[in-house]
């Protein structure tokens, strides 16, 4: 753990000290601590679609479909920078208090750059809309704001999801086989992901569905030929939560959890959101996968952790001194207000706007009018 050594040397040293079981645990989204080596516990699952999610008070920005309506790359980058400031403040406060659970890490499964082609899709508000170019440009701006520009450290790690051809409906996603034409695949569904890879996104999340017959989290086409081959992606790939189980439970491309885990890792899915990778112990015993193949994925994940400064003293890591006082602060709320104002598109007025200045009260109505978590 000598911080003076090059990162790759430190990764080599750590991998050499881990047992097979410890290596496999590091490929699950909920990492146990390796106390004998001073490796802390870490949970990879965190969300920041339009502000830090599910972790207490935070500045709430407009939904992503609203941010897309601003057409403002600089604004999106500033929004993401505020999110990453608050993320660092929350993370370091949590670690200081001995809390390392879900939603307290620095790896955010954001942004969602799927194409919102059908308005019936219930998660379309998470996306930047139906246009691949706009989605790519604004998604890249969000990556820039989340990850920062430090030459050694990532401020937080962004993740392009859900790769690929994943645009609803939710009910069918665990067994659906998307079969786009080559033209539609490369002109509609993939350009935004390519743009985020070019912008340096640290992670890519594989989708639940199959694309052209292969599960996205074990696709030789998507993960091998395109993502790492043509685009040169060097970060890590994470499965959507429970997606590896779908291999044998719904897609029926494997028979057992061990076969599913082995197939996913061999095809390049490094991190399992779920628990299927526990069966890699069985997969090694049954000679479905080698320890070297497991170490290839482990190396990518450790590289992300080192880039986040998770193995370095706090005083050596930029942003470790950000005060929790900045969370949901007046300047951050002002930026959220600006983003909301720029997101609004007036389609019809009928003389209602601008509102009279002498109004004493306004009625906000609807099923979620008082639901802050939804808004």
Q: For the regions a protein language model found, what residue spans apply to each?
A:
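Glycoside hydrolase catalytic-domain context in secreted enzymes
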Residues: 1-375
């Amino acid at each position: 753990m000598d911080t003076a050594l090059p990162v790759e040397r430190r990764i080599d040293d750590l991998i050499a000290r881990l047992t097979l079981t410890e290596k496999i645990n590091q490929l699950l989204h909920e990492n146990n601590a390796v106390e004998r080596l001073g490796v802390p516990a870490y949970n990879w699952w965190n969300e920041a679609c339009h502000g830090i999610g599910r972790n207490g008070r935070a500045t709430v920005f407009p939904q992503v479909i609203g941010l897309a309506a601003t057409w403002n790359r600089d604004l999106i980058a500033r929004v993401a920078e505020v999110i990453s400031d608050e993320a660092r403040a929350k993370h370091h406060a949590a670690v200081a208090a001995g809390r390392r659970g879900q939603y307290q890490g620095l790896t955010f499964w954001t942004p969602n750059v799927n194409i919102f082609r059908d308005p019936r899709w219930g998660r379309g508000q998470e996306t930047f809309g139906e246009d691949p170019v706009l989605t790519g440009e604004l998604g890249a701006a969000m990556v820039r704001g989340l990850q920062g520009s430090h030459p050694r450290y990532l401020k937080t790690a962004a993740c392009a999801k859900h790769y690929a051809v994943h645009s609803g409906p939710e009910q069918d996603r665990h067994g659906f086989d998307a079969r786009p034409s080559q033209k539609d695949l490369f002109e509609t569904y993939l350009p935004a992901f390519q743009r985020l890879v070019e912008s340096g996104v640290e992670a890519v999340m594989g989708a639940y569905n199959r694309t052209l017959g292969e599960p996205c989290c074990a696709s030789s086409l998507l993960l091998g030929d395109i993502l790492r081959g043509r685009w040169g992606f060097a970060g890590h790939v994470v499965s959507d939560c429970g997606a590896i189980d779908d291999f044998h439970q719904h897609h029926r491309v494997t028979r057992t959890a061990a076969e599913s885990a082995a197939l996913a890792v061999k095809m390049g899915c490094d991190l399992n959101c779920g628990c299927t990778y526990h069966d890699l112990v069985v997969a090694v015993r049954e000679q479905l996968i080698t320890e070297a193949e497991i170490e290839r994925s482990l190396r990518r994940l450790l590289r992300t952790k080192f880039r986040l400064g998770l193995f370095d003293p706090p005083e050596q890591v930029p942003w470790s001194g950000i005060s929790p006082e900045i969370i949901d602060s007046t300047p951050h709320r002002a930026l959220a207000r600006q983003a909301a104002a720029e997101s609004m598109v007036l389609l019809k007025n009928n003389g209602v706007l601008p509102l009279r200045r002498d109004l004493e009260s306004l009625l906000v109505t609807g099923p979620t009018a008082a639901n802050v978590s939804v808004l």
